[in-house]
Amino acid sequence: MTDQERLAAYDRMYADLLKERDKVLSDMDRLRAAGKNRGVTYQQLLALKLTVQNLIGRFEIYGIKEN
Protein backbone atom coordinates (compact mmCIF):
# COMPACT_ATOMS: atom_id res chain seq x y z
CA MET A 1 0.00 0.00 0.00
CA THR A 2 1.43 3.35 -1.02
CA ASP A 3 1.35 6.45 1.16
CA GLN A 4 -1.35 7.94 -1.08
CA GLU A 5 -3.52 4.84 -0.74
CA ARG A 6 -3.03 4.81 3.02
CA LEU A 7 -4.00 8.48 3.27
CA ALA A 8 -7.09 7.86 1.13
CA ALA A 9 -8.06 4.95 3.39
CA TYR A 10 -7.80 7.17 6.49
CA ASP A 11 -9.88 9.85 4.77
CA ARG A 12 -12.57 7.27 3.93
CA MET A 13 -12.53 5.90 7.45
CA TYR A 14 -12.93 9.39 8.95
CA ALA A 15 -15.80 10.19 6.58
CA ASP A 16 -17.48 6.88 7.47
CA LEU A 17 -17.14 7.63 11.18
CA LEU A 18 -18.81 11.01 10.69
CA LYS A 19 -21.66 9.39 8.76
CA GLU A 20 -22.08 6.71 11.40
CA ARG A 21 -22.14 9.34 14.17
CA ASP A 22 -24.85 11.28 12.35
CA LYS A 23 -26.94 8.12 11.84
CA VAL A 24 -26.60 7.10 15.49
CA LEU A 25 -27.61 10.59 16.65
CA SER A 26 -30.61 10.52 14.32
CA ASP A 27 -31.69 7.10 15.58
CA MET A 28 -31.31 8.26 19.18
CA ASP A 29 -33.42 11.35 18.49
CA ARG A 30 -36.12 9.19 16.91
CA LEU A 31 -36.22 6.85 19.91
CA ARG A 32 -36.17 9.77 22.36
CA ALA A 33 -39.13 11.37 20.54
CA ALA A 34 -41.01 8.08 20.87
CA GLY A 35 -40.28 8.00 24.61
CA LYS A 36 -38.04 4.95 24.32
CA ASN A 37 -34.89 6.46 25.76
CA ARG A 38 -34.71 3.87 28.55
CA GLY A 39 -34.79 0.84 26.27
CA VAL A 40 -31.98 -1.51 25.38
CA THR A 41 -31.73 -0.24 21.80
CA TYR A 42 -31.28 3.33 22.99
CA GLN A 43 -28.61 2.26 25.49
CA GLN A 44 -26.76 0.34 22.76
CA LEU A 45 -26.88 3.40 20.51
CA LEU A 46 -25.55 5.53 23.36
CA ALA A 47 -22.59 3.18 23.79
CA LEU A 48 -21.97 3.23 20.03
CA LYS A 49 -22.15 7.03 20.00
CA LEU A 50 -19.50 7.25 22.71
CA THR A 51 -17.26 4.80 20.86
CA VAL A 52 -17.57 6.65 17.55
CA GLN A 53 -17.00 10.03 19.21
CA ASN A 54 -13.88 8.63 20.88
CA LEU A 55 -12.52 7.50 17.51
CA ILE A 56 -13.32 10.87 15.92
CA GLY A 57 -11.57 12.55 18.84
CA ARG A 58 -8.45 10.51 18.22
CA PHE A 59 -8.37 11.74 14.64
CA GLU A 60 -8.72 15.31 15.91
CA ILE A 61 -5.75 14.87 18.27
CA TYR A 62 -3.62 14.35 15.15
CA GLY A 63 -5.05 17.38 13.38
CA ILE A 64 -7.70 15.68 11.24
CA LYS A 65 -10.87 17.66 11.86
CA GLU A 66 -14.35 17.94 10.45
CA ASN A 67 -14.70 20.64 7.78
Locate each region found by the language model.
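Extended, charge-rich alpha-helical interface modules
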Residues: M1-N67
